[in-house]
Design a protein with these regions (language model features):
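N-terminal catalytic cores of NTP/NDP-binding nucleotidyl/phosphoryl-transfer enzymes
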Residues: 12, 19-54, 260
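Long, compositionally biased intrinsically disordered regions
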Residues: 146, 150-226, 318-322, 326-449
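A glycine-rich helix N-cap at a beta->alpha junction
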Residues: 81-109
Length: 449
């Protein structure tokens, strides 16, 4: 199947063919330009974990990127954000498996992105992306090629599950699901052990797969007789939903781990009873790592802010606004201390002057009045200085937060590989793999050298 999908000369495919080979899998929708940055993070995590497991287990371990080519939610994949702008294309028809749609649908969005590019570096990346899509027939082919432009095709396998041969392998499970409502019954028997609130669970269907119609449209098959007929005679027309897809992955791959995001962790925790019912080993679920790439200005602003990473992320608009109030309050507090000291000094001076010559009290009073006038001048200068400094600090904070949380959304969910490549270069993905600790789910912050 993989050779037919264009990886005939891949060393990773040859490794996967070895009898003792294992896999670590991740998957994602076919987002424009790979979609949000966390797609790259998931793949990098998968590669890093595969290397570590191979070293520890002394058997071949192959990282696999599972293309969500059968997904039908076009509105989630038809756009990307860059530089505060949204670039999108129209996907018609909207209810078809997106992986089989023509790559040319993405041309207008990528052409607009290229026209909006700032500087030769962005321009080169946008033009390269556009060329990849122009050289591909379908969106699935384009995303596979784009993945391989960042990750080594000799190490990584990219698998399109919308394949008749793979569906034939999965046929026994599809038949059993149609006959027994396997996923639904397993969930009903095990949901009391679900580690999340039940309202976060995906509600299982009586049959947890979509059916492709004669013209390729995707729909739920609620008629179990129809579902069973398709499972027995045309399994290639069935597409596992989110609850059955992990079973599909484990059925056709020697999977020991799955790398996913927080949302995926929820539905994976619905499935242990289904794996048990089928006699399948349950892969380890590893939550993906996170990463943020800062520009030179962003990195400098963060360093000047003096905030650690968690405190920076916790800054709310109200807290940022309070910077000026805090600075002015500090000035007031500092002056109060000095004023107390001055008051004490003047009292001593008045007592000593009175003892020496009562007329000297007049001189002390005049001196005190002059000091009061100077105090007001000093206090006004200090407040102005505090406002200016707090304004600069707030500007620095806003600058770095605009990169870390663009539009209030974590960078890895808003921006794309285009941003990371502009900041860190063409090899940012391999460098990310090398930087990750495969045994943890950490958040890395990359600053320019």
């Amino acid at each position: 199947v993989l050779r037919r999908q264009g990886q005939s000369k891949s060393a990773a495919v040859a490794k996967l063919a070895q009898p003792e080979a294992l896999t670590v899998t991740t998957g994602q929708q076919l987002g424009l330009g790979l979609g949000p940055l966390y797609t790259v993070l998931k793949i990098a995590d998968t590669v890093a974990l595969s290397r570590a497991l191979e070293d520890r287990l002394k058997v071949p371990v192959v990282p696999v990127f599972w293309l969500a080519s059968e997904d039908h939610d076009a509105q989630e994949i038809n756009h990307l954000w860059h530089g505060g702008q949204r670039f999108s294309h129209t996907v018609q028809p909207a209810q078809h498996a997106v992986g089989s749609l023509q790559a040319s649908l993405a041309f207008p969005a990528l052409e607009s992105l290229s026209q909006a590019a700032k500087g030769w570096h962005e321009q080169e990346i946008c033009d390269r992306w556009l060329q990849i899509y122009r050289s591909s027939n379908t969106l699935a082919e384009a995303v596979r090629a784009l993945v391989f432009s960042y990750f080594d095709p000799q190490e990584l396998v990219v698998l399109d599950p919308n394949d008749s041969a793979l569906k034939q392998l999965f046929q026994p499970v599809l038949v059993r699901e149609a006959r027994e409502s396997l996923v639904l019954n397993a969930w009903n028997q095990s949901k009391d052990r679900f580690p999340y609130p039940l309202d976060r669970a995906i509600a299982p269907q009586t049959f947890n797969a979509f059916a492709f119609g004669p013209t390729g449209e995707r729909r739920y098959s609620e008629d179990l007789r129809e579902a069973l007929h398709l499972a027995e005679t045309a399994p290639e027309r069935l597409s596992p939903n989110a609850l059955l897809r992990p079973i599909y992955q484990e059925w056709i791959l020697p999977n020991v781990a799955y790398v996913g995001g927080p949302g995926e962790a929820v539905y994976w925790n619905q499935l242990p009873a289904v794996f048990d019912a089928l006699g399948l080993p349950l892969p380890v679920f590893k939550q993906r790592s996170g990463a943020t790439w800062l520009s030179v200005k962003g990195a400098h602003a963060w360093e000047r802010s003096g905030l650690d990473w968690q405190t920076l992320l916790a800054q709310t608009p109200n807290e940022r606004q309070s910077l000026q109030e805090a600075a002015e309050s500090a000035v007031q507090g500092q002056w109060s201390e000095w004023q107390s000291a001055l008051e004490g000094g003047f009292r001593i001076l008045e007592e000593q002057s009175r003892a020496m010559n009562p007329q000297m009290e007049v001189l002390v009073a005049a001196w005190r009045a002059k000091m009061d006038r100077e105090q007001r001048k000093w206090e006004e200068h200090a407040r102005r200085w505090a406002r200016e400094n707090s304004s600069k600090a707030q500007d620095r904070l806003e600058l770095v937060l605009a990169e870390v949380l663009p539009s209030g959304i974590p960078q890895e969910r808003r921006w794309t590989a285009l941003w990371a490549e502009v900041q860190a270069g063409r090899n940012f993905a391999p460098l990310l793999v090398e930087s990750l600790n495969p045994w943890t789910s950490e958040h890395l912050v990359f600053k320019p050298n």
